[in-house]
Curated annotation (Swiss-Prot):
Belongs to the CbiD family. PANTHER family: COBALT-PRECORRIN-5B C(1)-METHYLTRANSFERASE. Keywords: Cobalamin biosynthesis, Methyltransferase, S-adenosyl-L-methionine, Transferase. Gene3D superfamilies: CbiD-like (3.30.2110.10). The keyword Methyltransferase applies. This is Cobalt-precorrin-5B C(1)-methyltransferase. The keyword Zinc-finger does not apply. The gene is cbiD.
Amino acid sequence: MSELSFDAPVWRHGKALRKGYTTGSCATAAAKVAALMVLRQHLIHQVSIVTPSGVTLCLNVESPHIEGQQAIAAIRKDGGDDVDATHGMLIFARVTLNDSGEITLTGGEGIGTVTRKGVGLPLGSAAINRTPRHTIESAVREAIGPARGADVEIFAPEGEARAQKTYNSRLGILGGISIIGTTGIVTPMSEESWKRSLSLELEIKRASGLTRVILVPGNHGERFVREQMGVDTQAVVTMSNFVGYMIEEAVRLGFCQIVLVGHPGKLIKIAAGIFHTHSHIADARMETLVAHLALLGAPLELLTLVSDCDTTEAAMEHIEAYGFGHIYNHLARRICLRVMQMLRFTKTPPVCDAILFSFDNHILGSNRPVDEIAKELQC
């Protein structure tokens, strides 16, 4: 990525969005400038780094401080126009020079600790991912030269509080934020980074020994699993709108059973072969309902009423009034059929189940008895 492409906005739905930089870039810049300040013994207020993607960032330094052979500096995280829990917080680095010739990197206050397998870092280590570890160590080495050593501590006083707004606790990263970023640049509303974070949770579940997974669109699905199915929510992973992607990831990781649980407003799209359920990709909810109601022999009056509905909930009221509630079992079976069609070239496809529920947490339908599915999930 060139500097020009970094400055150029990302266009989403006709709106220009500004790029930002990652916590990894902040930590790298903070460590570099702290190392330089120790060597030069004077405060520095601006520092430049080259990100892994080749972009040169020139960043303002905050809270610079020197005390003997130790210096501290901070960089303020700027996520651009991305929705980011770490936006605006300070990422600090403390660099202490020594004669060991080695660079050691640790995480201090506000940096999470890895407590589960699956994130690619040793248990008990600081949640500083591999790419930022490399860039931090390289930047410090460049600053101090080949002979000196340094102890580098990355810390973030707001980290523990900010981490409450992230997926870290679900990933087994406790006590703070993660220092992340493979490119060093934050692309606003990047689907790829969002998908990757969801997939990472799948990897952690699999690494913990789970072989069966429940995919839900969001928090409502997890609550239903806990309250109505009596199943440990450790098996639940959010798929958001990325149904096809998360199913393929679950297959790649070797899960033997995938259970899709959600409200018809989301899952009905899968019955039509739509595996990205965001409304800007496709809708077809009413068309799908009308088609399958017709297959079940629904009267034209009901088909017309459903066709004119704007929401799935409104359509469900008509379906109930006409006594066609059995469509939900039919749709659940159709969802499973569509998933198996998508996985038709998979050598050992997993068992697929689907459960539909209402907003008041009542079971609407499933491809087979829910008790049977729940029993298997508890094995």
